Amino acid sequence: MEQRVLKTLEYDKIVALLIDKASCTYGKEKASELIPFLRLDEVINAQQGTEQAATVLRLKGSVPLGGIRDIRGPVQRARLNAMLAPMELLDIASTVMAGRRLKTFLLDMCDDHELPLLQQQAERIEGLRELETEIRRCVDENGDILDSASLELRQVRQEIRQLESRIREKLDQMTRSSTYQKMLMENIVTIRGDRFVIPVKQEYRSVFGGIVHDQSASGATLFIEPEVIVEMNNKLRELRLREEREVERILYVLTEQVSFAVEALVENTEALTELDFMFAKAQLAWSMKAICPRINDRGYVNMRKARHPLIPREVVVPVDVELGGEYQAIVVTGPNTGGKTVSLKTIGLLSLMTMAGLHIPAEEESEMTVFSSIFADIGDEQSIEQSLSTFSSHMTNIIQILAKMDDKSLVLFDELGAGTDPTEGAALAMSIIDHVIDSGARLVATTHYSELKAYAYDRPEVINASVEFDVQTLRPTYRLLIGVPGRSNAFAIARRLGLPEHIIDVARGSISEEDNQVESMIASLERNRKSAEADRLAAKAARQEAEELRTQLEEERAQFAEEKNKRMERAEDEARIAVQLAKEEAETIIRELREMMAEGMEIKEHRLIDAKKRLGNAVLELEKEKVKKPAKAVRATQIKVGDEVMVTSFGQKGTVLEKVNNEEFLVQIGIMKMKVKRDDMHVQNSIQQKPQAAPYTSVKRRSDNIKMDLDLRGYNVEDSIREIDQFLDDALLAGLHSVSIIHGHGTGVLRKGVHEYLRSHRNVKSFRLGGQGEGGVGATIAELK
């Protein structure tokens, strides 16, 4: 891509915006080198990288890119075993940690989302935790080597501190001494040339003694090292040299460790460069409200509500452009008001951005193509008195474009043919457009020559376009109108500015009838377009209103369904509670009767009537709380005396004893006899197939919890009889036909007592000792009636 074209279309300004979005030096450098790709696969890959990074920003809002330093220089020096400075080591540690943090962040995102390009780069980053830990163990945030870096360093620094303390103590004694105070300029201890000194007045030089290391600017003060601390200062100097050697040794060790990780650091650097660059593109897209366009290599462009990215969003006017489908060229006609050039640059710049892997400010579903090259001849016409040199300059550029273009090129001409005689200029413009079309290239050209309006109508590959102009404000609206040629609007503008009407009429009369017809036709087209646009907007508004109404109805329907479900759940909960209460009431009745029987009490008639009444009330409560009755397996007219039936409200089996009337039957349920409505039961032995499932509320059968055997081992005879009596009642209510009573071998007393009780029990049909696998003589099997 020619650099002149990139500059003409202001691509360099887009790159500057991209550089500003990068977080580190690596990303900024890569952004500065970005040029459009020329291969479809490269463009698609670059766009996918931008889209995946944009997805992360949409989901997370930000990305941990802080802490990345430019470590390429230190890494290369470490490769050569050149000692690294502490701050360089800190930069390496910071970058290692930043890379590891970014890797963890991205791989966590990749667990939930498809982000293959980001994942590929993240997986290149090596953690290098040991290297970072070792650097931070030895170097603090200010770049100083820590005492913990080595035992030798800790020891020598401790000696230095102790010796410095002794020296200061010695000098403090001198400054406080009355003998020396009159000789001192100030009672302080200071350092000159790494040696402790005190300020002495010039006149006491010979009296004070010692070594002079410095003097004040006036010469009145001498900084003297007293003789009593010379040896101590010498020792201090030796210790500091030891410290320097140890620090240097530590830095060499750390540098060596960096050299071992050079390849990994280079790989990390490259991965961080790619990631920072991708997120810079995503940040730019976010700031522009840009989208990822569809990409093709057919030369087809369909921009929807495309905006020039360098014009503020609050003032830019979107344009719709379709090129390369039905039409190969667009000729934008009309007066040179400036709006045409903006449209031309928008088409060119967005094409460059697409090919560079950048998202474009347009609506979703916009489609762009990959051009082999983009050429542009764009220059503002300053006046009607353009010089021949300007025309020659443009023509030289056009000649070069025509020589280089091919069938996959995009050619942009601004004010084609301007700067020369209008008749000749228009003829040249039409001939140049013909040549570009014949080459197969895509073309967008602007012109103010009216001759090209009719030309565009005559060529099926070419379509007219214009930039809308508001005659009232005398300003272009910058809306690109495809299919509508531009009008000069000269008469309308003159009238608006106050030119006398008779002058305008004379001017209009001097124009040929054909030109007047063309202008009238264009005016008619413009009126029809505005009418169609108004209808389209009205239809769009109606469609949007209908869509909003549909969405509202869907939401209301969903809310209604949710509320209905909640009410059903509440009803079912209430029914379950009522069922449980009714069940407990029924069990209480049965338990009371059982206790009365166990105590040998005669059950009076009024007691039995009261129990039946209470049980009947419980059944009625169950029936009231049913959500839905199950399908009847057999019609009520088919129920007859002797049938085994399932009583729905209790979930219990029973036997029909007699038919009371057409609505009720007398049913034996365990030890109880009760009236049951015909709709509350069905014949158990007549069900041939499972009825259609229907939700209903029922009592939970006791057989869900009752056991088939009763273990009496350890009980006496009296307690055993009470347990057997309750066990048999539960078994009968559960519909069991036989049970096992375990009494053990023992002395036989318990077995004998069990047998005597079973023999007299009214609901025991027969009993026997258990066989093999049934407990033998230690168990008794009872058959129930």
Curated annotation (Swiss-Prot):
Record-listed ATP binding positions: 334-341
Keyword Metal-binding: no
The UniProt record lists the keyword Membrane: no
UniProt-listed Enzyme Commission number(s): 3.1.-.-, 3.6.4.-
CDD domains in UniProt: ABC_MutS2 (cd03280)
Highest taxon of source: Bacteria
Family: Belongs to the DNA mismatch repair MutS family. MutS2 subfamily.
Full protein name: Endonuclease MutS2
Organism listed in the record: Brevibacillus brevis (strain 47 / JCM 6285 / NBRC 100599)
Lineage: Bacteria, Bacillati, Bacillota, Bacilli, Bacillales
